[in-house]
């Protein structure tokens, strides 16, 4: 119950700052509002703010309808056919699923340039809340559902968040929860190394979260996958954003406000990060320990359904508790009246996987042209992503062939509306060298536009520094 309440409050607290501070912290002199009635106001006028929660609830509803052994395709179809809009890895996965690329291929980086993004990380709360004290069972759930939209570090973010929620039920020591949950992540992964660095920096600078933030920026604020943020200040990568969650938990020292505030002031995805931190902390401490200052606004919405769902917070509390009891019994525990026995699990690492291995972003080339006027595009490297968008009639679906060096790479279908393709075209794993890209629009429409913004170019080695 505390987990769902905490993340709802965290989203509302950080919401006004989301991605307004990119590669920059929110300084202490910048006020962050939490006005009376603000959560209810968001429910009515900005329900999309709670996307990370109603995404969770999509999966919770499938478990409730089909049982705890529901097949992955059921989750994939529920997610892909939902009425809400999606972004980044989630939207790329929706497109893939609707075009026959099912999980886990729908989240694989070769099919999803956003595979390392934060998407499953902000949706994985349910996996830990339904597996109290059983982090490995949470990881099994994350293996199935997290690979719908993510891979590698993007998947690890959800595995780690789920494990922290799971362990939050059996330990009231935040440091233990953070450290033990990290044992679910392979030590040789970037994700593990970054979280471990944050833990070590916290020990080195126990009273200065801003120093840890600066160390983290220096070493880990590099995104190589997301076509919207790579080589730009915008970073929606799971690694850096989960570091901000951990910073809030460690430096917050069990204080609800301080935990949320630090995760928010780290910047970037500054509503989802405090939501994760506050949800985990409220799971450790319990619903009844959330300060009244924060609960006053929450109580106004506990009986209101989240957008795009038939579930309110009060219903979610009950449903999530029911699923947790089922998982406890499934994994050897027992229930006798009010007495519940959990067979606790020692965390073990999931398998190692890494996206974009051996790839180095070396430049973004501005295009700013419609596809019909682009002609050919020449670049040197091993991979390329074309960003942009399509506009046209509601039911229009463009069909475009992409060629590299005269060989067809794909015939892309480009729908308009909520089923759109996030990135227009991409091709990785080309031999290093000069390549020529051309396109053939098979069904042009005078009322449709396919606009290319820019091209993100990759090589198999870092760009040499030209001024040395």
Per-segment meaning from a language model:
Residues 9, 13-15, 20, 24-32, ...:
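Catalytic phosphate/nucleotide-handling subdomain of diverse soluble enzymes
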Residues 97-98, 105-115, 124-135, 143-148, ...:
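Accessory "access/gating" subregions that flank catalytic or transport cores
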Residues 52, 57, 61-67, 314-368:
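C-terminal domain-closing interface element
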Residues 42, 47, 53, 61-82, ...:
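N-terminal leader/propeptide and maturation segments of large enzyme subunits in energy/redox metabolism
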Residues 48-50, 55, 60-159, 170-171, ...:
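Active-site cavity-forming subdomains of large catalytic enzyme subunits
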